[in-house]
Amino acid sequence: MLLSILYLALFIYVGLLLARRAVPDGSVAVILPLGCGFGVSLLAVLPAVLALALGFTLPAVLLAAAAAGVLGGVLLHRGVRLRGMAKDADCGALWACILPVVLITLYLLHTHVLHMVNGAYHTGQSCYGDMPMHLGFIKYIAQSGGFLPCYPLLGGEHRFGYPFLCETVSSVFLVLGADLRTAYLLPMLPAFLSVYGMFWQLTRRVTDSAAKASLAFYLFFMGSGFGFVYFLGSAEKFADIFTGFYTTPTNFVEQNIEWVNPIVDLLIPQRATLFGWCVLFPAVYLLWRFCYEGKRRLWPWLALLALPLPLLHTHSALALVLLCLVGGVYTLAQGARRETLLPWLGLAAVCGAAWLAQMLPTVLAQSLDGQHMLRLHFNWINGQDDGTLKDNYFWFYIKNIGLVYLLLVPAFIHARPRQRWLYGGGLAILALAEFVVFQPNNYDNNKLLYVWHMLGCILAAQLLVDLFAKVRALPWRALGLAACCFAAMFGSVLTVGREIFSDYQHWSANDIALADYIDANAESDALFLTSDSHVTPVFALAGRRILCGSGSYVYYHGMDYADEYSAMAALYEHPNESTLAAWDVGYVLFDSSVYGKFADADESWYAARYPVWYENDGCRVYKIK
């Protein structure tokens, strides 16, 4: 564990040096979160590049550290130092603003990620679905050593079309000897600091106000719509928020409420979003200074920061492209000159080449030939397949987003010209996301919509602060702001409260014992026959390939898994040796999830032919070869 901490510290230190070099006028409150963004970006890039030649192995991981050390040495040799940073009178305002959210985040990470309770792993509501997939990907990449990795949730050879660099940033620590919980959590800590700190710094830079930055921060991270109204009818209905499964004011499908809280429903459970925003938010900060403040020297630093973005979070990469396109139009509108256009061409050339190299064999190929991927669809999850809408277009967003949505038009009118151009990039994102879906799950277009919403929160916060500044009586000013904050945030407060109290068993002691035995004794490339339960410990905890993973994963990754599913069912209900050989199955698991799905599972056929390889009170595993 100590080696992993030192490894992460090296990358963060080099990231801080890069941030200091990129923004020499930055204060500690800017350099620290910006440096975390650079550090995580390096952590994604360097091990992956070296793994292309060496596999995802210890030599590749150590050489990546050496490369980071060389980069840090070059920066130090060129006189870059962390001391002597600019003073910032608003530094305290940043930390006072983000500290409550940071504490909540740390507590939820502690209770939601492999939290040991009486010998079993527990989690919370938001992580019950997604986290097993992320754990399995992280473990598989580390223990298999192959790179580019194959898709481990289906038998045979399948393209890994998921943005897997959000997993490799944890896999490196498994290779270094850390346990799975430590490896999972370590890179998330600087990532959260980057997301929170750079959102605040971006807003402060755009609005030139710490007060507006703080209000925008809470409008975004703790903002919500009017979904709480549906729970005010009775004490019993209100109590459902804290006892039901996904019956919260920000996630209540029954009433078409699905504008979720960014912290508990996006950043904590969805690693791609976290690591995407960890790079995107500082990138937008640099983009603002590069494009709208005329700091043309920043383009190489923006390009360097954004290098791994497509395979960290493809939606964030697309959002950044659209923001840059609008920024480029703004630059042209100011007058096309050689000194203003060349930096844009450099940024486009570097990112275009690097991004295409990453995307062509992975996410782009998957988008083009995957199942139910790129297609037309109107109005996010409010739109239905027959072209009709569940709710009126505007009412849907009013009740989901709430006050911020109602203020968008007056806030845009109130904004300064450069701010309108920046928000114009958000409108481009909205327009694309409302008409084109990039994955089988329409819901996942919210990864684009939240970037538009982020920019809307900045304008709304500016309008509210300026509006109430005109109220001379301090009590009325405070009362008005408090009322707006209540209307804009009460739903998220309840949602976060529900998440804090949620507690579910993820894996039993028997599941953990099975995973430990597999980890120690099974071949790294072994294929297991299991049920398609999303929590099967064979994949989630031991990182081994399985014949057919949960449809809630493989379908939404655009995979055609009909053959694997049929083979799984046949091998449990009507097993035969030729099908086992055809799929190269090495082990067969029988546990409660198998019998829950296949009541006629024929374990006796395996017992008569193959030895029991492992057994505990919850399962038996037969070794086929």
What is the role of each PLM region?
Residues 1-91, 103:
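Membrane-embedded, hydrophobic transmembrane alpha-helices
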Residues 102, 297-308, 323, 345-350, ...:
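Transmembrane alpha-helix segments characteristic
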Residues 102-279, 314-318, 504-505, 532:
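Active-site lumenal/periplasmic loops and adjacent helix-entry segments of GT-C-fold
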Residues 104-109, 222, 226, 312-316, ...:
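Transmembrane alpha-helical segments
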Residues 189-192, 273, 318-321, 442-469:
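Hydrophobic/aromatic-rich transmembrane helices and adjacent perimembrane loops
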Residues 264-267, 286, 298-314:
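Membrane-interface alpha helices of multi-pass inner-membrane proteins
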Residues 282-290, 323-334, 399-420, 466:
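Hydrophobic, aromatic-rich transmembrane alpha-helices
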Residues 472-625:
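Extracytoplasmic
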